[in-house]
């Protein structure tokens, strides 16, 4: 039954966590690590102080964080209020984390004369700057860059699709992928 299945999955999840406690489900766990990097020490400790161990999956690997045990003011602290500007500062950290994760998957097919993580990060920054901000779009852009080379988006026909702001980012990216497929199609 669904109740038995739910109980079994809950048991497996809680038993796989090395420390007994509760799980907090974030809407977008990939942002948790970058958020911890972007906030100041006090805000980071206030966030981490709400639990004894934090575990999250960033789409590539499991991550872990613990609060500072030498914190001079332990005890209850309200969670910090984060402004939109502060959340925007997480973007470079998120892109760097994605680049590090993609390196393991794509390193064998990347240019040999550059550092893999730096090359991937530069491509992800290009994609983000062009309006492709979702993780699925970032990886699709990266695959295009691997196949077509860095700066592919500045050359026709890709530049034509990229400049068409009347279309959604997903549509423009699909059109660029289609152009690549047309290049390699047999007649």
Model regions and ranges:
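A contiguous, surface-oriented mixed alpha/beta subdomain in the mid-to-C-terminal portion of proteins
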Residues: 2-187
